[in-house]
Structures are given as C-alpha cells and as structure tokens.
C-alpha cells in the first residue's frame, strides 16, 4: 500500500509546474496568460506529421526565448521550437509525430526573460488527433 501511495504522489501533475505561468484555457484554443502573454495555434485541428504554426504575443522587450514540445499522453522525447518575430507576433513552424494513441496531448514549455531580465516560463497544451 505504501508503494502504491508513493506512485500516485509521483504521478500528480499538480506538483510539477508550481513556479510557472499557466492558465486554465482549453487545449487548442487561444490562451491569455496573467503576464500579458498569449499563445494560439495557426489551426486548432492538429494532425500528426502535418505542419502547423504556434503563435505567441509576449510582453514588450521579451528576449532569450527557448521553447520545446513534449508529449503528455505518451513521452516521445522533445521537439525544439525556433520562434521568429513577425511584427508583434512570434511564430514557430513545427509538426508533431504520430503516436499509438488516437488523441495525443502535447505541452509547449516556453521560457523567456522580461525587459528587466526576470525569467518567465509558460505552458501551452494542445491535442493532435489521428485521422487515418
């Protein structure tokens, strides 16, 4: 029973992202964060192995962006993201791999520094759906 309790505590997703900026938006939807950041997909209907873009609006002066995608439903390693600024929006073109699950949840982790060099981290979740 003790080992079962330890296992359940280790799987608690609430214990992982305490010091980060997250939001309660729905997967695949435009998300607004408390620090005036926004994240959204070029197309809310994501299919594996099909290109799409992730868009960001960040506070003025944001710099040193680093981002990656990781599978939540099934860990499949991580996919680095390269954001490029296009006007007021940061854009990363990417795609996700196919998984044995029909619906796969992905997590984008983004870190950046504010204009006064304060580090910030935000998370954005979305689902890909196997259509074949």
Predicted regions and their residues:
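C-terminal motif of bacterial Sec signal peptides marking the signal peptidase cleavage site
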Residues: 7-10
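Sec-dependent signal peptide recognition
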Residues: 1-3
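A short, hydrophobic secondary-structure junction motif
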Residues: 112, 130-132
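Contiguous segments within soluble domain cores/interaction surfaces
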Residues: 12-101, 105, 124-130
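Short, exposed beta-strand-loop hairpins at the edges of beta-sheets
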Residues: 108-123
